[in-house]
Amino acid sequence: MIFGYVTQSDKVEKRISITPEIVKKLNKENIQVLINKDYGKNSNISDQHFVDAGAQVESVEKIYSSSDVVVQICFEDPETAKLLKKNCYLIVNHFNKNNKELESSLKSKNINIFSLDLLPRITRAQSMDILSSQANLAGYKAVIDSVYEYNKAIPMMMTAAGTVTPAKFFIIGTGVAGLQAIATAKRLGGVVSATDVRAASKEQVESLGAKFVFVESAENLETEGGYAKEASEDFKKKQEELIKQTIKNQDIIICTALIPGKKAPRIITEEMVLSMKPGSVICDLAALQGGNSAFSEPDKIIEKNNIKIIGYSNFASRISESASNLLAKNIYNFLELIYDKESKSIKIDMEDEIIKNTYVGESN
């Protein structure tokens, strides 16, 4: 079989879906690997490294037309879809079901699509979990980027000239990204507090040495999969008041609150932003989904009242070498599940929960 890997053409996405290490593994299974020119450039991997591992460098058109399996971070161009080999398999991080023109193009060629962001949260799928591996790095990078924009030292320093007080971090949302943000901020010497609508996250937050700030409520705001779900209006009002009182004393705020399939909840209002100390920084990981914070805009740093609001849309891509290494392993583990070594072909077992969840179907 031929597996083809193509980079994204947009400026924000710098990650790749395969590394030379994975190329070698696929070659051992008699799988031919094709990549486009400069495939690993943004992750500091030269074409020669890929070639030495056993990959072939081909044009994008050749890859699309000859590959039995095409792996790409995102696939959104209906015209490009026309280049794909009929009946091939398309594996992406996220498939946009609302792109009807793309859907029509893929359906006309009977393309089978897997969207890896739909992996179930079960133990067997952990090694394939692209959301967790990338969110972990995003939480780390969000803290690093925030510290870069912050104009003071982070840890407490006691010197002959006086004492430098530690920076105060407030983490909103304690999923994978939020927990890594807490851990990173603590390692840098910050004083960290965090909040989440899920009461169950209290233990995790405190185990990392942070203070948990929480609205007491009888509501269960956690899905069976462990994600946060939308709160009632009464809860939102209580949460808003709690955050309003907390936020004014913070130096750096990291926002990571997302609700799967919905617009990001607006947690920090304009009034809250303007109540913060001059020089403070807000880092909004949800900017692309509408933003947790007022004023945040995707891929921009906005300054209001001497307060910076960071809205990068893809924090994992900003640390692309590490992100690509983890992503490539996640995807390889998924490929191992659907590739049958005996028949040397892709086999779709719809009884398998992982395949059933991720299989978007024939562009359906």
What are these regions (language model features)?
Residues 1-109:
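An N-terminal-biased, well-structured beta-alpha scaffold segment characteristic
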